[in-house]
Every structure is written in structure tokens, then in C-alpha cells.
A protein has these predicted regions:
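Conserved small/polar residues in nucleotide/adenosyl-binding loops
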Residues: 157-163
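Short Gly/Thr/Asp-enriched flexible loops that form oxyanion-binding sites at enzyme active sites
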Residues: 74-84, 105
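N-terminal intrinsically disordered, cationic/polar leader segments
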Residues: 4, 9-26, 33, 43
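A short beta-strand-loop structural module common to alpha/beta enzyme folds
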Residues: 31-39
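Short, glycine-/small-residue-rich phosphate/pyrophosphate-handling segment
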Residues: 106-132
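N-terminal beta-loop-helix "entrance" segment that forms/cooperates
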Residues: 38-50
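Short, acidic/small-residue loops that bind anionic groups at enzyme active sites
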Residues: 85-103, 116
């Protein structure tokens, strides 16, 4: 049975570390590769490594990219590769361990990168929890659709991110 190939992409060795963690929990996986952007490397180095990872998959028709950070170099370079395969490939940013494990489990029954990508987002979000529970954000009412906001739109107005020039 053909399985969706998974590229885990990150700044630094995060991708290799989370690959190891996922294997400890779920077992060794075929057609999964970690692709890292190291401090001494540039976008072209990363892209070449990503292309080599994809070429190593037994089936390159269906590829899912799990990326650490939306808008960073690993995302931008995987996005460049993705552009020619939008109908089959998918990218999910915000990589965490629940996301990776759910992707592994989903590959057993789901045959498309799009299907897996859509499925793992909720699990990834649910993996972010806090104790004590009262520190958790209050559930916002699901009224975005009525207010005319486009479906699937996400608002980041509540986040204050540091400005990082080198990503």
C-alpha cells in the first residue's frame, strides 16, 4: 500500500528531534524525512535537502510537509516546491508532537496529503494545554462565519511576535 510521504521541516535540529520522539511513541516510519535549515545554510541548501527527501519516497505523488513556523525559510522553500503540486501536496505549519503522531496514525487509513492535513489540525491545536486550567483562554463563540469573515480565516491580532530578521 502506498503511503503519503511526510517531510518534517524546521529551523535547526527540531525536525530531527521530533522525528526521533515520534518514532519512540509510534515506531519507525517509512517515507518520513527530517529536513533541517542549519545556521550555516541558506534557502537553496534547504530546498536541495527537501528535494532529495522527496525523491527518496517510494511514492512522490502524495507529500505532506509538517513545518515548524509559517513564513520562515523552511516554510517558504517547501511552499516553492508545493506550488507545482497544489492538487496533491499539503503544508501544515506549527509542528508539534501530537500533530506528527496523528499524521502517522492517519496515513494508515487516509491516502491523500490533503485529507491528512485537514484531519491533523484539530489534534495539533488540542495538544496545546495549560495547568492550572483557569489559565486557558476562554472558548470564543463560533460567530466568525456570521460576521462576514472568510471561512478558514485566522486572526493573529492577539499575538505579539518578536521581529526576527534572519528567518
Amino acid at each position: 500500500k502506498k503511503m503519503v510521504g511526510i517531510v518534517i521541516a524546521s529551523h535547526g535540529q527540531f525536525a530531527e528531534g521530533i522525528l526521533q520522539s515520534g518514532n519512540m511513541i509510534f515506531g519507525e516510519q517509512e517515507d518520513v524525512k527530517a529536513v533541517t535549515l542549519m545556521p550555516s545554510e541558506g534557502p537553496d541548501d534547504f530546498k536541495a535537502k527537501a528535494e532529495a527527501a522527496i525523491k527518496s519516497f517510494s511514492d512522490q505523488d502524495q507529500v505532506l510537509f509538517l513545518v515548524d513556523l509559517w513564513g520562515g525559510t523552511p516554510f517558504n522553500q517547501t511552499n516553492n516546491l508545493f506550488e507545482e503540486h497544489k492538487d496533491k501536496w499539503a503544508i501544515v505549519a506549527g509542528l508539534n508532537l501530537p500533530m506528527l503522531i496523528e499524521a502517522y496514525a492517519s496515513r494508515l487509513s487516509m491516502n491523500s496529503a490533503h485529507e491528512i492535513a485537514a484531519h491533523i489540525i484539530e489534534t495539533a491545536k488540542d495538544g496545546v494545554k495549560v495547568k492550572p486550567e483557569e489559565l486557558a483562554p476562554k472558548e470564543a463563540p463560533k460567530a466568525a462565519a456570521k460576521s462576514g469573515a472568510s471561512a478558514g480565516a485566522v486572526s493573529y491580532t492577539h499575538l505579539t511576535l518578536p521581529t526576527i530578521c534572519s528567518v
